[in-house]
Regions:
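Alpha-helical support elements that line or immediately flank enzyme active sites
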Residues: 8, 12-31, 129-150, 290-314
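Short, charge-patterned binding micro-sites
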Residues: 39-59, 327-331
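Internal helix-turn-beta structural module
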Residues: 46, 318, 325-430
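C-terminal catalytic subdomain
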Residues: 269-271, 276-322, 331-339
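Glycine-rich, mobile lid/loop segments that gate access to catalytic sites or pores
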Residues: 6, 66, 73-257, 388-392, ...
Length: 430
């Protein structure tokens, strides 16, 4: 009979993502001037206000006001009509120094023996249903948001778009867990009030005309551009172009009030969007605003790196990797693997987990070094998910009061590199 599976994504202007991007912008600025910074930065955004709180231990200084205003402006909140804009929003800082007790558990005489910054379990997942080794429903939902944001920034089509938006994609699977079609696509996008009651004859007529226009543009502009610009597999292109897809566009009928004025946003509230869209599992720890001594972040990236390379090497078609840590302890407490019965080698999941232990050094310091996590790479992760992107180099410029500007070339999304495939094949005799 098969089944349906659904995942969602959100835009850069979603309130929770605004908060994530501010937290990671603060983190990046501190790491740019002091790579050994310890940071836990939490942000709340609401009508006309940004509150930044958390714990920091660093030799760098962050110009919080400039960082916040630049981040909000880059996202697109630049108009007073939004009731949250980069020029006028109030900014409150409640940042203080990191606890000595936590710092004592992390610092060691030898950096290699650096302890984990907290306890917890972290998961990495990969499958082979997309070329990014990501689940198809989340991959498509993310592609829709990336394309919609590109359209908004270009300002040539769908010129009524505002920054806040969400997507949701429901995929049909057969009994063998193979994607066979797309059942439903949902797009909710904030928009200007581009047809007035005076022009339409009544407010109801204006709302209906705006909704009809947005629905048409989603189907005739957003979907074709997503297929052309984001989807590379012929089978998935065909699925997305099918005539029998059910479309839900702005189901409430109108979406003018949005962003932090419509909903208060908090750092760390989109952890499923940030990872695998509900596939696999999640340990509960958020990523944004945390330096890599926090294994919530660094070990989740390491687990994704392991999972992706194992699937790419042909060990399994699907895999979930769990790592667990204790605060102050360097070595992981446990390594767990689940291949869902889809392994291609004559080994049990437990035996695969032992291979993982020998192939990958999973101490926090080793993860930081291998994935280059002590560099200012995090703002880019806070939008459109932390997993599934192409690794790339980028030159970034940072400003700090009393110091010359700093230009740094960084490598983004290192945990998406397929640099362990050959080692894994050799270890498994493939």
């Amino acid at each position: 009979m098969g089944y349906l599976f659904t995942s969602e994504s959100v835009s850069a202007g979603h309130p929770d993502k605004v908060a994530d991007q501010i937290s990671d912008a603060v983190l990046d600025n501190l790491l740019a001037f002091d790579p050994h910074s310890r940071v836990a930065c939490e942000t709340m955004v609401t009508t006309g206000q940004v509150i930044v709180a958390g714990e920091v231990r660093s030799n760098a200084w962050a110009d919080l006001t400039t960082i916040v205003r630049d981040t909000v402006a880059h996202i697109g909140y630049t108009k007073a009509d939004y009731k949250f804009d980069s020029e006028s929003c109030g900014i409150l800082s409640a940042i203080h120094e990191q606890s000595d007790d936590i710092n004592r558990g992390v610092d060691r005489r030898s950096p290699e023996e650096q302890g984990a910054g907290d306890q917890g379990m972290m998961f990495g997942y990969a499958n082979n249903e997309t070329d990014s080794y990501m689940p198809l429903p989340l991959s498509l939902a993310t592609d829709l948001m990336i394309t919609l944001e590109r359209i908004r920034r270009e300002g040539k089509e769908m010129t009524y778009l505002r920054p806040d938006a969400k997507s949701q994609v429901t995929v049909r699977y057969d009994d063998n867990d193979r994607a066979v079609g797309i059942d439903t696509i949902l797009v909710s996008t904030q928009h200007d009030e581009f047809i007035t009651a005076a022009e339409a004859g009544s407010q109801q007529a204006a709302d209906e005309q705006m909704l009809a226009r947005i629905r048409r543009d989603v189907i005739e502009i957003l979907i074709p551009r997503t297929i052309a610009e984001r989807v590379h597999t012929p089978e998935i292109k065909q699925m997305l172009a099918a005539d029998d897809i059910k479309y839900l566009v702005n189901p409430t009928g109108k979406f003018v009030i949005g962003g932090p004025n419509g909903d208060t946003g908090l750092t760390g509230r989109k952890i499923i969007v940030d990872t695998y869209g509900g596939r696999g599992a999640h340990g509960g720890g958020a990523f944004s605003g945390k330096d890599p001594s926090k294994v919530d972040r660094s070990a989740a990236y390491a687990a994704r790196h392991i999972a992706k390379n194992i699937v790419a090497a042909g060990v399994a078609d699907e895999i979930l990797v769990q790592l667990s840590y204790a605060i102050g302890v360097a070595e992981p407490i446990s390594i767990y693997v689940n291949t869902y019965g889809k392994r291609r080698v004559a080994l049990s999941d437990g035996e695969i987990a032992e291979k993982v232990r020998t192939l990958f050094d999973l101490r926090p310091y080793a993860i930081e070094e291998r994935l280059k996590l002590r560099t200012p790479i995090y703002t880019e992760t806070a939008n459109h998910g932390h997993m599934g992107h192409q690794p790339r180099f980028k030159t970034k410029t940072f400003k700090c009061k009393g110091q010359p500007d700093k230009q740094i070339e960084v490598e983004l999304f290192t945990w998406e590199k397929l640099d362990y495939v050959d080692k894994i094949k050799a270890a498994f005799g493939l």
